Amino acid sequence: MKYGEKEIQEFDINAEENFWPNEHEKNYTINIELPEFMCLCPRSGYPDFAIMKLSYVPDKKVIELKALKLYINSFMYRHISHENSANEIFDALYSQLEPKSMKLIADFNPRGNVHTVIEIDSETF
């Protein structure tokens, strides 16, 4: 096993070192695009690819970017649906960051003539 595979396999999104203190009191938005998301279809095992777009207004914490990359890469060999992967990512990040607001857009590549976009927005809760 290569060192990168090991790091991804052993990654824990809930580890304290993955989140840093937000040193600013003013409201500002962090926009992050993750263009290489991959998971496996739970039915066929075929790969699904997506661009994940995360946008949040931090409160007390921000996510360390390498941690976010490792977390997203941890889905690479998981059999999980579009809806479940987007919701799992949103829920994990939202519960750890406790942001003032957060939105995740999971824009999956078309497969079988179907293009899926999942949007989850804390403003709609």
From Swiss-Prot:
One Pfam family it belongs to: QueF
Keyword Cell wall biogenesis/degradation: no
Ligand binding (substrate): I63, E64, L65, H82, E83
Top enzyme category: oxidoreductase
Pathway stated in the Swiss-Prot or TrEMBL entry: tRNA modification; tRNA-queuosine biosynthesis
Chief localization: cytoplasm
Reaction(s) this enzyme catalyzes, per UniProt: 7-aminomethyl-7-carbaguanine + 2 NADP(+) = 7-cyano-7-deazaguanine + 2 NADPH + 3 H(+)
EC number: 1.7.1.13
GO MF term list: preQ1 synthase activity
InterPro entries assigned to the protein according to its UniProt record, in alphabetical order: GTP-CH-I_C/QueF, NADPH_dep_7-cyano-7-deazaG_red, QueF, QueF_type1
Active site: C41 (thioimide intermediate), D48 (proton donor)
Any one cellular-component term (Gene Ontology): cytoplasm
Keyword field contains Cytoplasm: yes
Subcellular location: Cytoplasm
Database matches in SUPFAM superfamilies: Tetrahydrobiopterin biosynthesis enzymes-like (SSF55620)
Keywords carried by this UniProt record: Cytoplasm, NADP, Oxidoreductase, Queuosine biosynthesis
Record GO biological process: queuosine biosynthetic process; tRNA modification
Role, per record: Catalyzes the NADPH-dependent reduction of 7-cyano-7-deazaguanine (preQ0) to 7-aminomethyl-7-deazaguanine (preQ1).
Family to which this protein belongs: Belongs to the GTP cyclohydrolase I family. QueF type 1 subfamily.
Protein name: NADPH-dependent 7-cyano-7-deazaguanine reductase
Annotated source species: Sulfurovum sp. (strain NBC37-1)
